[in-house]
Amino acid sequence: VSESILDLSASAPPAELAADVCIVGSGSAGATAAWVLAEAGLRVVVLEEGGDFTGAKLTQRDSEMYDQLYMERGGRATADLSIQVLQGRVLGGGGVINACDVVPVPEGVWRHWQRVHGLSELSPEAMAPYAARALTDLSANHPDEALWSRGNSLLRQGAEALGMQGAAMLCDRQGCAGLGTCLLGCPLDAKQSPRLVAVERARSAGARFVTRARAVRVAGRGGARRVHVRALDAMGYHERGALSVRARLVVLAANAVATPQLLLRSGLGNTHVGRNLMLQPQLPIVAFFEQRVDAFRGIPQAYAITQFEHEDDREHGLWGFRIEAIMGTPGIVSTLLPWVGEASVRAMGQYAHLAASLLLTPDAPSGRVALRDDGRPLITYDHADEHKARFRQAAREAARVYLAAGATRVMVPSVPAVEIRSEGDLNLLDSLAFKPATTPILSAHQQGTVRMASSAAHGAAAPDGKLYGEEGVYVFDTSLYPSSASSHTMTPAITISRYLAEQLATTLRA
């Protein structure tokens, strides 16, 4: 097979592919690993369940893009329906559909991983060149404020009125026109995602990418591994054939749900696999203004209030919360608002008058990925009382900010909705109980389910990513993180994957 991108939906799949390294997952971690290992002269095959979408294929249409770019059409959730679990299913992974934010791992997190989890190799000093390289790979920059949506400006206006510390966020845009549909992919290819950077560099170095390829099991032993794959149809929902990839090594980088799912289906790894899940939940908050805001025009997420982050937390490395401006398309926003019928129509009639934020709140390990009887993932999560309390505090501060910016009312879109019209209403937020299926809590930064540790007694993978108890199986994605990276995970994933891939390349060359 000579194609550098082989679409299994387009022709009869080959019975077998051969490689030195088979990588499962083409997102930030997988594409970066493919780039490094291919440039080291290794034969690399990368498996991706989704399709390849760039340029005009990214239609900006909610129903089409959610169907094709998101796992389970964006409907994946915890078992109790309390948290929506957003994950990419596309060549290039979640970096294709994120809000372009470039947020490195805070120094306090590296220190915490050293001190508490025994990962002495991951010092801030040792990881600094890899973090810097990640920023280069992403063309990290501060976008022109003329391209910001007004929602960002209103958040900053309110923060400054209250004397709160905030900052413009780094992004990975080049040639942005401010279309505002980042969460559905960029049809201008302005987002310098893994698809446009790492995948292309890996292809140039000889790596092959296989799309519409669902990895279902890892078999074999030692240096003779085999990944069993189902070929999918053009829409990615029906199997149309099977093949296998024969490889010396397998690197799993499929995300913190799919990686443990594949290990559990394969009977690989120790009892830590699937445990220690962190979802880093985010709570949306919406503000309504008398004047038009048109927050859907321009970059949706460019400013964050950082006043309430705490880098020196002894237990977690980074704690507190961030308040980050955001905006979605009508399809996205309508699913988050708590009304139905005529009330929903009235609310969406105010779409041009609203601004929104996400309250990003790092969590401690408190969830698990297990298998349903049919092999699909079962995601359970214990939403800790302490985390709920930080959500309430974050909502209180965000409401104060929007009121200071001139909002007529601020709403947490729970059922029933909690609406704040003045600071005298802030105590209403104490009623937020976050019961399952009552509040649209989101997770876009899943971590921790194949925890990296200094010994098998404390985790599932070694500091070099090698799965404890197995030869020839490695994990390079956010599943490894022993505690929350406390940031948007694209940049951490690129940083850590490059570090691990360079180590692996050196080992294989020796």
Label every PLM stretch briefly:
Residues A18, A168-M169, G178-C182, V216-A219, ...:
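A glycine-rich dinucleotide-binding beta-alpha-beta segment and adjacent secondary-structure elements
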Residues N98, N270-Y402, K435-A437, S443-T449, ...:
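FAD cofactor-binding and catalytic pocket of flavoenzymes
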Residues L42, E49-A99, V105-G108, N152-G158:
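N-terminal FAD cofactor-binding segment of flavoenzymes
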Residues L91, G95-C176, L359:
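Rossmann-like flavin
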Residues V36-E39, R43-V45, G50-G55, Q60, ...:
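Glycine-rich loop(s) and the adjacent beta-strand/alpha-helix scaffold that form part
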Residues V1-V21, E39, R498, T506-A510:
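Extreme N-terminal leader/targeting segments of oxidoreductases
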Residues L91, G95-I97, L135-H142, G166-A205, ...:
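Helix-loop-beta segment of a Rossmann-like dinucleotide-binding subdomain
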Residues G30-A31:
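N-terminal Rossmann-fold NAD(P) dinucleotide-binding loop
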